Curated annotation (Swiss-Prot):
It comes from Neisseria meningitidis serogroup A / serotype 4A (strain DSM 15465 / Z2491). InterPro entries: Aminotrans_V_dom, Aminotrans_V_PyrdxlP_BS, Cys_deSase_IscS, Cysteine_dSase, PyrdxlP-dep_Trfase, PyrdxlP-dep_Trfase_major, PyrdxlP-dep_Trfase_small. Pathway: Cofactor biosynthesis; iron-sulfur cluster biosynthesis. It is found in: Cytoplasm. Keywords: 2Fe-2S, Cytoplasm, Iron, Iron-sulfur, Metal-binding, Pyridoxal phosphate, Transferase. This is Cysteine desulfurase IscS. The active site is at C328 (cysteine persulfide intermediate). Its main location: cytoplasm. HAMAP family: Cys_desulf_IscS (MF_00331). The modification N6-(pyridoxal phosphate)lysine is found at K206. Its EC number is 2.8.1.7. SUPFAM superfamilies: PLP-dependent transferases. Its cofactor is pyridoxal 5'-phosphate.
Amino acid sequence: MTVKTPVYLDYAATTTVDKRVAEKMIPYLTETFGNPASNSHAFGWEAEEAVEKARADIAALINADPKEIVFTSGATESDNLAIKGAANFYKTKGKHLITVKTEHKAVLDTMRELERQGFEVTYLGVQENGLIDLEELKAAIRDDTILVSVMWANNEIGVVQDIPAIGEICRERKIVFHVDAAQACGKVPVDVEAAKIDLLSMSAHKVYGPKGIGALYVRRKPRVRLEAQMHGGGHERGFRSGTLPTHQIVGMGEAFRIAKEELEQDMAHYRKLRDIFLKGIEGIEEVYINGDLEHRVPNNLNVSFNFVEGESLIMAVKELAVSSGSACTSASLEPSYVLRALGRNDELAHSSLRITFGRMTTEEEVQFAAELIKSKIGKLRELSPLWEMFKDGIDLNSIEWAAH
């Protein structure tokens, strides 16, 4: 089997722009170049029409009203606008916020910033499977709690939280509920009405759209208020000033339209690839799947291989584009904070690979990846004195290493 290498298996970091999306974008860079805010001539009207069509397509994927979609530069900005915007608007009602230890840095660092501004944040832990305990969430809610932020699907381990149940808890107590859905859109059904979500962050480049464009869903009924974080010409109903990049918005709209249309077949494709990969690595000993396999986006596998050094593993499989830890932070050699939150030890957290499949991934590529990983794990373990000791039945935890 000849597979063109390197094989891209890092679709949770970014996706290719679908050819249909790129084609749709090009005219808005050349011919239809007007500013959508120019309402006195045809160039502006045409651009505005394209923006509104995209807004409707994005809203359709998440079952929202187009008027509830606010364009941003991506999910990081959407997270910032949602969390800071809501916290600043509702701070007279209370200054307590709740989130989860395994959230994306865009949420965690925003929360840290609000702590510096005098807000109090509760960081919920997760169970071994990566899911939060709903009873723990209920217990954390106080009279002065104004916002809960929980991601739909985790960027590292792909675990899907019980968002409708959390939405129910928040709605009952009149608490604003924000969801980072960057990794969920186009991979699992997303319905803001059914899940009682107030604010939802989205990104185009995780859904075969262009980078640098995202959106924030802001509920109108019951209305959720935000304080703007970007000031200027009052674009996007005052929520987010700045000239709209028509070509990127058109790209995001088309990407979300295709995602809605092809969701079922995409999900089936991902499941098939996941099963092929799992079957391919079946024989390897001391393999740990990180995160719940049931409650999970179908295109994500995060696997730890005991007695293998993470960095040497990445180097050994250089024919594969995969990541260890989250791409935003994989430049640091710190073990993944998400895996640590699951209770994984440093060794297992270090030896993890995140393998994420995409629309363009083939069965042959996945077969190749599984076989390559299997053979490299074998070779690396042959070199490992720890593996040898483990195979000899020595309990490595009982060894007292000499301090140098």
